[in-house]
Amino acid sequence: MLYWLLYEKLYPFFRTFRIFRYLTVRTAFASLTAMLIALFIGPWVIQKLREFQIGQYVRDDGPQTHLKKTGTPTMGGILIVIAILLPTVLWSDPSNPFIWVAVFSTLAFGAIGFADDYIKVVKRRSLGLTARAKLLCQGVAGTGVAVALVVLEQFRFFSTRLTVPFLKQWRPDLQWHLWPASLPYLALLAFVPFVVWVILVLMGTTNAVNLTDGLDGLAIGCTIIAAGALTVLTYVSGNVVFADYLELQHMPRVAELTVFCGSMVGASIGFLWYNAHPAEIFMGDVGSLALGGAIGTVAIIIRQELLLPFIGGIFVLETLSVILQVGSYKMRNGKRIFKMAPLHHHFEQLGWSESKVIVRFWIGALVFALFALTTLKLR
């Protein structure tokens, strides 16, 4: 809205406001605004969560050192969502449809996380939503994102072609071109592979961030790095000069998502101030699912979802550790690969301090993200 006011309306009278035309300037302001919102509202949110006795439940089958965290205010993801969305609305172009797709995804997955946290914390059911109910809700939210993008594809704002890392020319299309355009209702079936793909990507990212959120500041620190990488990727994908030079799919309207990514970085930095070890607040599922939905949606829109294993490398490793642990336990008569899963608990059991695990995983996340950016030229 500030973009509309300062540039669209007041620029003819105050030429200085011309700077708000530039995406980099608005991204910087959005990031700073998001960080300040999180920093200044954080203490109030923590106080209110304590007043309502919304505290973390710690299972006794996890690391025993975590039992002291019982009662720490949780559901702090509400603060993250507010700190992301307000600056996005303030500093982005409200006529850009991709902004609203990202906002919808963040809110939808955040709502699923909120319901899960509410059941766990308020209703005192330790496991929250059942796995089936959670996956169903995630599928519905993912379908909503996919349908919105299909509509935008019809207006030629979006492409269903994938960008494949390391390959310049091969861009497989996630549409089935089996039906003639003269049969519009039948032709809609062409988008089934794309819709299924979007649902799977969003389920993967949301649950991966959720699994990583097990140590103070771990998930939010990795999110800062992943969102920073997405900020760069979004900007170059929307800039005709950079996209042409790097031979990326150029979609001019996706550039506005740089503001959204900047807000995500700023909000995450502000939240980390209170979530750093020893944490004063936890994000809960409302935060992890909202962030996972935001990361996955941005990657899908800029057609870089195949880079997600590198952009969010730690998220992927954490998820793989759980899959391997469960698979090994079921298929090898109770034998485990790791001392405990997810992966960060394995290193705790090896004797690493919580702070050491967190910082080393952040370093790993940074290395993965930097490699993701180098793939733009390694093709």
Model-derived features: positions:
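Hydrophobic cores of alpha-helical transmembrane segments in multi-pass inner/ER membrane proteins
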Residues: 139-148
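Membrane-interfacial loop-to-helix junctions in multi-pass inner-membrane proteins
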Residues: 95-103, 122-137
